[in-house]
Structures are given as structure tokens and as C-alpha cells.
């Protein structure tokens, strides 16, 4: 996995004029913040020069036919970017290399009562994540859902082409208070998304107050 930059802004942040920040305005600000971080790093992993300051090209967020966003630098394709909302904030993640990226945030409160766990999660993956969450099913479900949602965003299909149970989340590697999950697609999902066959899909998950933040990476060069 290459470098990734992520940050958030409060969904209802006040602007200097005293007006609330809309989701669209927050996203534009997030793009500017993350772009400046990428430029400052002067990443050797991005294949083109990263302009800034007076030499900067106009930056747009454009989407492919399935809705997967990436930056457009003038007429040149830029790095992948992803957005999500949760916990009262708008989040964005920008990839520092040519990988695709997806971000998601989920809260435990979303997974209570009669939530259809069996239609969304496979028994083995849920059991593993519940053990990571100390037996808290709601917290574990938020973590697992954020992993799956981030993965399909990085693949660029969302849940239009695959079902949640077709995203298989394997046991995590833990380090520095976060988890890294390898993710694979089921055979059924690969029939609909053959480009995903053998691809390297990794999801990094971090606790954020009452939410889980997950960022997925898909490297189309690696199998």
C-alpha cells in the first residue's frame, strides 16, 4: 500500500460568514487540504509532476460511469479520491500513488436490534471481528461494514454489482491501534467483476471516537 492522506471537516462547520458548511463545500475544502499534503510530500510514486501555487492546474473531481471519483488536473488524470459521511463529519481520502481508494465510516448505533446480520456478514468473518471488538456485536458490525463498504468503493462498483456477503473479509493484522484486513471477492462476485480476480485488496481500519474509519486500497498492477 502506498501513502494515503485523509482528513475530515464537521458536517455543520461554521464558515467565517456564519453560514453552515454544506456537504459540497466541505468536499471542495477537503480536496484542497489533501492536495496540498500530497504536493508537499513530492511523492515519487505519482508518475507526473504535482503542480501547486501559481503553476497549479485547475483541479476537478470527476467520476467514472459507476460513480468512482478521481481528480482531474487540467486535462490530466490525477489520483483517486473517496468521500464519506459519518459521525457528524465529511471525510475524504486521497491516494498518493496509482492505486484506487475507498473510504467509509460506520457507527455502532446503526447495527442494533433486528439488523439483518446474516444477510450482510458471513459467520466466520463476523465471529473474528466480534473477538476483536471484545464481544460487542454492534461495534464489530460497524467495523466489518465499513471494511466492506470501503472495499467496494475502491473497486468502483459499490454494491451495484456485488452483495455484501460476496465481500470476504479475512483475519486482520493488528498494529499501532489499527487493523489491516485482506479482502477477497467471492466466485459469484468475480463473475460480475472479473477485473477483481486475484487483485490485491487491503483495508486499513482505525477507531474514531464512536465510529470506525476504514480505507481500502486496490492496486490493479498487483495480483
Predicted regions and their residues:
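Core catalytic alpha/beta fold that binds nucleotide/phospho-ligands
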Residues: 1-223
